[in-house]
């Protein structure tokens, strides 16, 4: 199974991924934020670097799915419908089920989380400006998805997420 988390910065994607993995061990988490710092020790957060790491996430997704692993995509807003479609097609070409989780919350909640995590989040470019930049270009995807409002209680969100994955 391929589980894709998408949403604006600060909407709780990584938090929900950690909750999922705690409830359902065995998923291999691919995080662009983690991969970026692994392959680029001093990232500049350029479009070229982003594209390189996104391509790496896609390649690794295919590799892991080919080897029977369940994969969770984290650390990517996936604001581009085309990039989300690419991940869906990687799974579809392998006849692997895909679940898309779209994380949402109030803008003030996201901005508060971003401010709280300033300097400690693996994405060094994460900030208020990035939030609004991503928001301006965020595209809907044409695939079924579960929208999770992370302003709601965590227990109900995790329950809905686990039910959606069955």
Residue ranges, per PLM feature:
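Hydrophobic anchor at the beta1->P-loop junction of P-loop NTPases
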Residues: 5
């Amino acid at each position: 199974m391929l589980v894709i988390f998408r949403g604006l910065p600060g909407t709780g994607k990584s938090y929900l991924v950690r909750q999922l993995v705690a409830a359902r061990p065995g998923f291999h988490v691919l995080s662009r934020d983690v991969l970026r710092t692994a392959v680029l020790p001093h990232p500049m957060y350029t479009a070229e670097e982003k594209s390189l790491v996104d391509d790496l996430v896609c390649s690794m997704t295919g590799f892991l799915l080919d080897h029977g692993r369940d994969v969770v995509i984290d650390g990517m807003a996936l604001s581009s419908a085309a990039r989300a479609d690419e991940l869906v097609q990687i799974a579809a070409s392998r006849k692997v089920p895909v679940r898309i989780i779209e994380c949402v919350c109030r803008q003030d909640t996201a901005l508060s989380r971003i401010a709280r995590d300033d300097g400690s989040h693996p994405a060094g470019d994460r900030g208020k400006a990035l939030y609004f930049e991503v928001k301006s270009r965020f595209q809907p995807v044409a695939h079924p998805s579960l929208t999770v409002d992370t302003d709601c209680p965590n227990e109900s969100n995790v329950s809905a997420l686990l039910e959606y994955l069955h």
